Amino acid sequence: MNDQRKGDHAEPTTHFGYQDVPESQKAKKVAEVFHSVAAKYDLMNDVLSGGMHRLWKRFTIELSGVRSGNRVLDIAGGTGDLAAKFSRLVGPTGQVVLADINDSMLKVGRDRLLDRGVAGNIEFVQADAEKLPFPDNHFDCVTIAFGLRNVTHKDAAIRSMLRVLKPGGRLLILEFSKPTNKLMSKAYDAYSFAFMPLAGKLITNDAESYRYLAESIRMHPDQETLKSMMVEAGFDRVTYHNMTSGIVAVHRGIKP
């Protein structure tokens, strides 16, 4: 966050992609992006990742340790990829809460899961990751996939996730990160800033939203920084696993 102020009473600013915007405006701008892309979000995920996002999510689920009877919170759950899989794992005695701050994404997720007949043990909640509306010590596992980079105050969100977890509960953060290979990093930059907006224009008629998404990835904390943020929030045994040469990483932490 950029804490520079133009005057004694100026509002703090934060980044929206590569832009500096007042903190109060970021959530609105992010909401506009996801209202725009919600209907074709799944299609664009497949196109832009070549289907790899499904493998990344599968590995995250394996790391979660979720089992029958667990209560799981999937933040920024969007169209319900993770929630559908957790629903099967927790079974009829468990519960999955799919939370998203964006009502358009939440509607797409609800409709998609209802159509697939997998929403029996899933609750849909519109919620802000920074101020989760759930009791303390409530969930066995909390996940957030490709959502943390869009949160204004990431540290506050991580603390909120810690609060709602039971002692011994697990947080998993799946997010784009910093490539570990210089050649891969250069290729990924070219891909992100040329192909992603072009694909957005051709498929959704919205290049700007995908330009923002590319920029937001670059502004997100790298692997070690995010690990430190989780430790500072109070998580124990924080580890991360790089996937696809660090383009994506999944972090896991345990509530003491």
Swiss-Prot record:
Name this polypeptide is given: Ubiquinone/menaquinone biosynthesis C-methyltransferase UbiE
EC number: 2.1.1.163, 2.1.1.201
Record: residues binding S-adenosyl-L-methionine: 79, 100, 128-129
BP terms from Gene Ontology: aerobic respiration; menaquinone biosynthetic process; methylation
Biased composition (Basic and acidic residues): 1-12
Region entry Disordered, spans: 1-23
Family classification: Belongs to the class I-like SAM-binding methyltransferase superfamily. MenG/UbiE family.
Stored Gene3D superfamilies: Vaccinia Virus protein VP39 (3.40.50.150)
Keyword Transferase appears in the UniProt entry: yes
Catalytic activity: a 2-demethylmenaquinol + S-adenosyl-L-methionine = a menaquinol + S-adenosyl-L-homocysteine + H(+); a 2-methoxy-6-(all-trans-polyprenyl)benzene-1,4-diol + S-adenosyl-L-methionine = a 5-methoxy-2-methyl-3-(all-trans-polyprenyl)benzene-1,4-diol + S-adenosyl-L-homocysteine + H(+)
GO MF term set: 2-methoxy-6-polyprenyl-1,4-benzoquinol methyltransferase activity; demethylmenaquinone methyltransferase activity
Domain of life of the organism encoding this protein: Bacteria
Alphabetized SUPFAM superfamilies for the sequence: S-adenosyl-L-methionine-dependent methyltransferases (SSF53335)
Role, per record: Methyltransferase required for the conversion of demethylmenaquinol (DMKH2) to menaquinol (MKH2) and the conversion of 2-polyprenyl-6-methoxy-1,4-benzoquinol (DDMQH2) to 2-polyprenyl-3-methyl-6-methoxy-1,4-benzoquinol (DMQH2).
Record keywords, A-Z: Menaquinone biosynthesis, Methyltransferase, S-adenosyl-L-methionine, Transferase, Ubiquinone biosynthesis
Annotated CDD domains: AdoMet_MTases
Pathway as given in its UniProt record: Quinol/quinone metabolism; menaquinone biosynthesis; menaquinol from 1,4-dihydroxy-2-naphthoate: step 2/2; Cofactor biosynthesis; ubiquinone biosynthesis
Claim: Ubl conjugation is one of the keywords in the record: no
